[in-house]
A protein has these predicted regions:
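Glycine-rich, small/hydroxylated-residue low-complexity segments
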Residues: 6, 19-441
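N-terminal Sec-pathway targeting helices
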Residues: 1-13
Length: 441
């Protein structure tokens, strides 16, 4: 028995030694061949490969965004949509890649990606002093993404290097940005991501901060349009130059999408525990603001056509109009299943009062005339059909009446009173608007 165990142990050790010495070398050569093949494709499609250095188990190169016209055509063939203006803006951008092969037990390929040259358009519009500062930051690899791909090419993990730096009058902080996921040869099948903190602070114009974001994505089945995604954020704060500030706490976003028979049905759910808006004169606060919106029977064919069209190309205008008509007249329906708030701040008393709830749906007439709408946008009103239900607490209704922009409307629109609530049932059909059964126009 002891000899058997010893033999098995020696066999395992020998196998591992063979793998790490000989098998690893063979795999490294195959990985290098694959990289060569992909770089050759990129070179034929507008990119230039510069400063390439190849070593036994690693290599370095710089990917130069050189020919925007060729690159845009290549991206279009790969179903990656980029506007012509956006494509031109990136001309001259350079991204360096440091690749290591077969590092450790997990990784087949490890890479660091970081910019080494700004687009020409940015360089031309930047002062030499600021350009020198930016170039110094690029040399320090301030913006760096690390990525590991596992040895059976089914999953990945990575992170973004922490940032705490200043660009002129703009301070940027980013900490603990991590991601991982699973994939096949065709597409991403699952992923998670997290950000501990992200903020942009300017001297005068705008300050934005975000804390503790966690996101997940999971594909369902073979269709890229069938998936579940979820994001949770502890806090988002925005400070504007005019003194207005916005703060949101404990945010949840869920998106459930399913596809069948060339149609997409999606649900979007959002939850905000707290929303605070403060300007120079007023303060607005809402507790437990929740919504659920669904989009039904969205045409996959029309959506994919729209994604492939260059809207700046006049030759594709007819194709664009056809896709839009298919998208909006093929039974597509938008449902606002609910938008509701538990409590709303009465700023005059600084006390929270009962809130509101609402629901609605919108559809478009299948016989819509796009040419008429293009020449007369108001013609769209005759093609819309909608119903809505809005319920305000008595306290919130009394607050609304005090606002100048609403008081005049409420003089002509009388609500239904029921269970300490004010109710508005709204119908819009055939260019006629009714509220609580009374025709407004």
């Amino acid at each position: 028995m002891k000899k058997t165990l010893t033999s098995i142990t020696l066999l395992l050790v020998g196998s591992l030694v063979y793998y790490f010495i000989y098998g690893s070398q063979q795999i490294t050569q195959e990985l290098k061949r694959q990289v060569d093949m992909h770089l050759e494709v990129l070179q034929k499609n507008g990119f230039a490969i510069e400063e390439r250095e190849i070593k036994e188990s690693s290599e370095h190169f710089v990917l130069h965004y050189k020919d925007p016209t060729k690159i845009q055509k290549y991206f279009k063939e790969k179903n990656i949509k980029m506007k012509t203006d956006d494509t031109q803006m990136l001309k001259g951008f350079k991204l360096a890649s440091d690749i290591s092969y077969m590092q450790g037990f997990y990784s087949a390929v490890s890479m660091d990606l970081y910019p080494v040259a700004l687009p020409e358009m940015i360089r031309e519009k930047t002062t030499q002093n600021d350009l020198n500062k930016m170039q110094k930051l690029l040399k320090e690899k301030i913006f760096l993404i690390h990525l590991d791909i596992n040895k059976i090419f089914t999953s990945f993990k990575g992170y973004v290097k922490d940032i705490d730096t200043t660009f002129g009058t703009i301070k940027v902080v980013s900490t603990q940005v991590k991601f991982d996921g699973d994939f096949t040869t065709q597409r991403l099948t699952a992923s998670t991501s997290s950000i501990q903190e992200f903020s942009i602070n300017t001297a005068t114009d705008l300050n934005i901060s975000l804390k503790n974001l966690h996101g997940t994505y999971k594909q369902k089945g073979d269709s890229p349009y069938s998936f579940d995604s979820k994001q949770q954020i502890d806090m988002i704060a925005i400070q504007l130059s005019n003194g207005t500030s916005v703060e949101l706490k404990n945010l949840d976003f869920l998106n459930n999408s399913n596809s069948s028979d060339q149609r997409i049905n999606s649900q979007f759910i959002s939850k905000f525990a707290e929303l605070h808006i403060i300007d120079t004169q007023n303060r607005y606060s809402i507790e437990n603001l929740n919504s659920k919106i669904s989009l039904e029977k969205l045409s996959i064919s029309a959506l994919e056509t729209l994604q492939s069209i260059d809207i700046n190309n006049p030759k594709e205008r007819q194709k664009l109009n056809k896709a839009i008509k298919m998208l909006i007249t093929d039974g597509t329906r938008l449902n606002i299943e609910y938008i509701k708030a538990n409590k709303v701040l009465d700023s005059s008393t600084n006390k929270m009062v009962d809130g509101f709830d609402a629901n609605a749906y919108f559809t478009l007439n299948k016989n819509i005339n796009l040419r008429e709408i293009q020449s007369n946008p108001f013609a769209l009103l005759s093609a819309v059909e909608s119903k809505a239900h809005i319920s305000l607490s008595d306290s919130l209704y009394n607050i609304a009446k005090k606002r100048a922009e609403l008081s005049l409307i409420l003089l002509f629109v009388k609500p239904i009173s029921k269970e300490q609530k004010k109710i508005f049932d709204i119908t819009y059909q055939n260019s006629h608007l009714k509220i609580n059964g009374n025709q407004i126009f």
